[in-house]
């Protein structure tokens, strides 16, 4: 850990700024600021070599630690008791998002990992879902940065567009809460959009969104199973299952269960949530520090187009399913 200290210190200090800005601009959020700051750092500053081990470690390990601590704010029992009724909307829209990202990702010649991350982020809970899936599929920093940037862009758009459309279509608080909870990616954006519509819509959307976020677990397990199956097909299955199962997903589940059964004092939960946000910001600074604007230009508009199509498919399917079920 000694050789990582300098880089970790840089990531920590730089992460404080995005977290501060995220409190003042919750629509954008600390994750966006952290990723941009990391990229700007890489572009404008010639980073010393002894900072690289710590920054690289932040981008990989702290990303996983942020997911573990996020588990404490997602108590499975509490969310499930109130949000199961929304699954008949959430599950089909999650499927639609994945299929749209995979199909159109192939059409626009996106790399396999990039289209998977865009689909995962659109389907479940934005940056947190991408952070959970990236280590499992062994995505690189460029793929993480491109997918997160795509998701963050549409999160910000949704905050402004969804309430306007809700009023134009005269949606009830229940309808808008269900729609925004199933069709907007990031939790902060869901909260911003839904509570701007009404308090009742905001409360409904939050429950739906948390229920949707819990799908991180089964979908990650599905990715693990797929990876194991492919390894088996290639004759590399000996000892692979142990290597494939990511320890941080196991600890995420443990954290959620501990929170559900009340073993974690309520007074501690806000601090654990803040720690998750800090680790995520530090991780994104580390990831951004290995990405350049040239890589974004080289990728072109394809990631945004795939993200846009997947987003439209999710929003549209959510509305159609509401008309069928309610």
List each language-model region with its residue ranges:
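Alpha-helical membrane segments and immediately flanking helix-loop junctions
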Residues: 111-158, 175-198, 275
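Helix-coil boundary and interhelical linker segments in multi-pass alpha-helical membrane proteins
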Residues: 20-23, 76-85, 166-175, 195-204, ...
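Structural signature of multi-pass alpha-helical membrane transport proteins
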Residues: 2-59, 70-78, 221-279, 283-300, ...
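Membrane-embedded alpha-helical segments of transport systems
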Residues: 147-162, 182-191, 207-221, 311-314
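Helix-loop-helix hairpins and the membrane-proximal interhelical loops
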Residues: 58, 66-112, 134-152
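Transmembrane alpha-helices that form the ion-translocation and gating core
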Residues: 88-122, 153-171, 298, 305-326
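Structural signature of hydrophobic alpha-helical transmembrane segments
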Residues: 26-40, 82-95, 119-122, 148, ...
């Amino acid at each position: 850990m000694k050789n990582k200290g300098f880089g970790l210190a840089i990531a920590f200090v730089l992460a404080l700024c995005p977290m501060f800005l995220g409190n003042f601009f919750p629509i954008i959020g600390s994750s966006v600021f952290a990723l941009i700051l990391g990229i700007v750092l890489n572009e404008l500053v010639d980073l010393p070599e002894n900072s690289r081990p710590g920054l690289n470690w932040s981008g990989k390990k702290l990303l996983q630690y942020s997911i573990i601590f996020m588990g404490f704010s997602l108590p499975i029992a509490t969310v499930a008791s109130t949000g199961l009724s929304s699954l008949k909307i959430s599950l089909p829209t999650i499927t639609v998002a994945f299929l749209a990202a995979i199909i159109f990702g192939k059409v626009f010649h996106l790399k396999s990992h990039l289209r998977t991350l865009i689909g995962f982020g659109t389907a479940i809970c934005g940056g947190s879902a991408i952070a959970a899936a990236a280590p499992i599929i062994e995505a690189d920093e460029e793929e993480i940065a491109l997918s997160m940037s795509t998701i963050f862009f549409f999160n910000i758009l949704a905050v402004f567009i969804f309430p306007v459309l809700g009023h134009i279509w005269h949606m009830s608080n229940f309808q808008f809460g269900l729609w925004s909870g199933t069709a907007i990616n990031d939790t902060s954006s869901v909260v911003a959009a839904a509570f701007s519509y009404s308090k009742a819509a905001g409360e409904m959307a939050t429950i739906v969104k948390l229920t949707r976020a819990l799908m991180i677990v089964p979908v990650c397990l599905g990715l693990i199973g797929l990876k194991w199956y492919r390894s088996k097909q290639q004759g590399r299955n000996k000892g692979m299952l142990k290597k494939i199962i990511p320890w941080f997903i196991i600890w995420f589940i443990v954290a959620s269960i501990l929170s559900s059964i009340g073993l974690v004092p309520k007074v501690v939960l806000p601090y654990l949530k803040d720690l998750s946000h800090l680790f995520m910001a530090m991780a994104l600074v580390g990831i951004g520090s290995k990405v350049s604007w040239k890589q974004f230009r080289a990728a072109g508009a394809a990631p945004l187009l795939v993200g846009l199509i997947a987003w439209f498919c999710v929003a549209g399917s959510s509305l159609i399913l509401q008309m069928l079920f309610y």
